[in-house]
Amino acid sequence: MLETPAGRLWLKRVETLTLRWRLLKGGGQRSFEKDRDGLHFLGEAGMPVAPILAEGPDYFVTPDLGVTLRALMSDTGASDDRRAAFHAAGRALAALHAQGFSHGRPAVRDLCWDGAEVRFIDMERFSPRHQSPRHFAADIFVFVHSVFAAGGGEAELENALTAYRNAGGPLQASIALARRLRWIGPAARGLRRLKPHSRDLTALEPTLAYIASAR
């Protein structure tokens, strides 16, 4: 983070990864380039993403876009702001899908709220080729799962998915996917005996149940 007379800026550089993380995430340069290229591509398409203010071969700079939805969920005194932010998140995701784009990983830590709108960051999983209802359904799954994993629940999701649906977001593919994958819930329950503190495993069953019952 950089404090400047023009405001707060964020500097992103190529990550230096250990062998283990390179195997899991791919090379740091490749992830950096996908993130930067995704921000450029979607920004030029008029989508709500972080604008790149300056860049070089191994860095780029974006403005501060406010608080992430993940951080906002931890602020117990921001209930009105949280409702507005999740409503805006649903609209932003619907706008992305309406133009035939998917984010790839729209988790609550990758959506920023500035008090007026939600914008997306971290586009390492974005691909302009991922344009099908299956990819939109995966976005919804990642978003809902991230809410439950962060300790949120139906209040936040109702705001987001109502706004998503009202803005023309296609939920039917997400509902169908969740119903097909319901068998994962009991399997995750068994795995939690081995990893009882895993938030990701704990969030799987409520994620599938919530999406499968959506209307």
Predicted regions and their residues:
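Catalytic-loop of the protein kinase fold
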Residues: A98-V108
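Conserved hydrophobic alpha-helix
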Residues: L42, A92-L96
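Conserved structural core of kinase catalytic domains
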Residues: E15, S31-F32, V49-H87
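Structural motif at the C-terminus of the N-lobe alphaC helix and the adjacent alphaC-beta4 loop
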Residues: R30-E33, D37-V49
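C-lobe/activation-segment region of protein kinase-like
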Residues: R119, M123-R215
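Conserved protein kinase catalytic/activation segment
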Residues: D110-D122
